[in-house]
Design a protein with these regions (language model features):
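C-terminal target-recognition/interaction regions appended to catalytic cores
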Residues: 109-314
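Class I S-adenosyl-L-methionine
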Residues: 1-159
Length: 314
């Protein structure tokens, strides 16, 4: 009855091999192959304004079976616009972590350590500053070869860059365990974001289980066992979070579909009977009926009632 595609902003214009063997834009293929059966809408959204806590611009395509097109448009199923949230509002209350610390009350509030010689590269950075811009060459990312400093190549401006507290969180990449990856440095502390912080940024519920232990069981483990488990599982968890679909965005779409399916959707004959029974030709009765929606009707049915009553008054 419905389908949803999510991909990069240029998804619909990207070339692909069509069923006939030719190269066509993905969007053209979708409309050709599915357009006969589905009403299709495509929108480019920055998820930061649609329920995610990080900035990520994506294409979302929603299709609705034409059998239901009289009652719902795919546009109605998109998540609602919301104001973006700052990183501080999302993770600002998380406890600070010492070097290599695993939070005693939250196993997932921990970060992957890195060689301590690299710490001076980011230690003095203010929000928005990059380690490659440090004046001291020893504080710029480098390696030592035959006793000589060899600077690392700066391929991206957002590597080794301290994030802003009062801006929306950045897009989360798969190698979010590394300082050398994009937008990974905590706004205040000399570390990457913890798994728990990443979960909050990506709207993954706190109760989600990454391993077959409850949080209480994980918190009760001896420190040695905690470190061993993190060593085994942390990279897989982080890579699953990076580039993931923000759960809250698609929860809203699913909720909109669920609400639609639970509503009544009337034919024209039933709508005319409803107008008669509720005396909806009276404007005041119509307004109250739409506001209260006593029959739990879908938007299309309510709009049709308003349309028919207005035409009858004319």
């Amino acid at each position: 009855r419905f389908f949803i595609f999510e991909n990069v902003a240029a998804f619909m214009k990207t070339g692909c091999t069509a069923p006939d063997g030719s190269v066509k834009a993905i969007g053209d293929v979708i409309y050709k192959e599915l357009g006969e059966k589905y009403i299709i809408a495509s929108r480019i959204l920055n998820f930061k304004n649609y329920g995610s806590n990080s900035s990520r611009t994506r294409t979302v395509v929603i299709g609705v079976n034409r059998e239901m097109a009289e009652y719902v448009s795919p546009i109605e199923l998109y998540p609602a616009y919301v104001e973006e949230k700052s990183l501080r509002s999302i993770i600002g209350n998380m406890p600070e972590l010492e070097w290599g610390e695993i939070c005693s009350s939250d196993f997932y509030h921990a970060f992957r350590t890195y060689p301590e010689r690299m710490r001076c590269w980011i230690h003095d950075l203010k929000e928005g500053e990059c380690a490659f811009d440090n004046q001291d060459e020893l504080k710029r990312p480098h390696k030592i070869v035959d006793g000589k400093i060899v600077p690392n190549i700066q391929k991206n401006g957002d590597k080794y860059t301290r994030q802003y507290w009062d801006k929306v969180a950045p897009c989360i990449h798969t190698r979010n365990d590394q300082l050398a990856s994009q937008n990974t440095v905590h706004p205040k502390e000399d570390r990457v974001f913890s798994v728990r912080e990443l979960m909050k940024i990506m709207t993954i519920p706190d109760e989600f289980k990454w391993v077959n232990f409850s949080l209480e069981e994980l918190n009760a483990l001896p420190e040695k066992n905690k470190k061993a488990l993190l060593k085994k599982e942390e990279i897989k968890i982080r890579q699953s979070i990076g580039e993931a679909v923000p759960t809250n965005v698609f929860f809203q779409i699913a909720e909109n579909i669920k609400n639609f399916m639970e509503q009544e959707h009337f034919t024209t004959a039933i709508i005319n009977k409803t107008i008669e029974n509720y005396k909806l030709e009276d404007a005041e009765n119509l307004i109250k009926f739409i506001q209260n929606n006593p029959l739990n009707l879908g938007n299309a049915s309510l709009a049709r009632i308003a349309e028919l009553t207005n035409s009858k008054r004319e």
